[in-house]
Amino acid sequence: MFTYYFQGLALGAAMILPLGPQNAFVMNQGIRRQYHLMIALLCAVSDLLLICAGIFGGSALLMQSPWLLALVTWGGVAFLLCYGFGALKTAFSQSLELANAEVMQQGRWKIIITMLAVTWLNPHVYLDTFVVLGSLGGQLAVEPKRWFALGTISASFLWFFGLALLAAWLAPRLRTARAQRIINIVVGAVMWFIAFQLAREGVSHIQALLN
């Protein structure tokens, strides 16, 4: 059974490692040392729920609801554009320290809501957990399926806590004005790139539905 566990662990790591909205948010909270472990836990728990839903039957709902997929896609596009704009606005702010100070004054609930939006409004999360993991895990018997799910869940917990702790450890070097400007530019550019990719997919989905 450990074979299925390590298969899930490897696949989960491969899907979670690329820079995306979740990773960028966890990294920034780690650099600020602002509720970073709480955010890592909430991201990992969100992944746990999505992984279990995808592997244990939720993929059928998404595949049978193309309009739901289109709605999630365009909601994600709107959010990523706004998130990227905020990062770029901070990067090119004349007073970067003032902009960072305003971010540091955000309350816990605002940070939690942003994290939930980053996770649950990202269509790639549903494609990864419902389509990829759902199609692979759905082919397994009950016991191997549980070990496969446990492996992918382990990858999420290890990655998010590792990223948050590493970012907090490197915070003294990454809190400089130059480093913060570079990080915000990269995050903003990546968010907009993902948003435009999703928009193309969203247009294709709508065209397919209307034909």
UniProtKB/Swiss-Prot annotation:
Q: Which Pfam families match?
A: LysE (PF01810)
Single GO term (MF): L-arginine transmembrane transporter activity
The answer to keyword rRNA-binding applying to this record is no
Provide the protein's localization: Cell inner membrane
* UniProt key word Transmembrane helix: yes
Name the InterPro entries on file: Arg_export_ArgO_enterobac, LeuE-type, Lys/arg_exporter
Q: How does it sit in the membrane?
A: Multi-pass membrane protein
Its Gene Ontology cellular component terms are: plasma membrane
Which catalysed reactions does the entry list for this protein? Answer: L-arginine(in) = L-arginine(out)
What are the entry keywords?
A: Amino-acid transport, Cell inner membrane, Cell membrane, Membrane, Transmembrane, Transmembrane helix, Transport
Q: Membrane spanning segments where?
A: 1-21, 37-57, 68-88, 111-131, 147-167, 179-199
Q: Which PANTHER family match?
A: ARGININE EXPORTER PROTEIN ARGO, ARGININE EXPORTER PROTEIN ARGO-RELATED
**Function description:** Involved in the export of arginine. Important to control the intracellular level of arginine and the correct balance between arginine and lysine.
Query: What family is this protein classified in?
Result: Belongs to the LysE/ArgO transporter (TC 2.A.75) family.
Query: This protein is called what?
Result: Arginine exporter protein ArgO
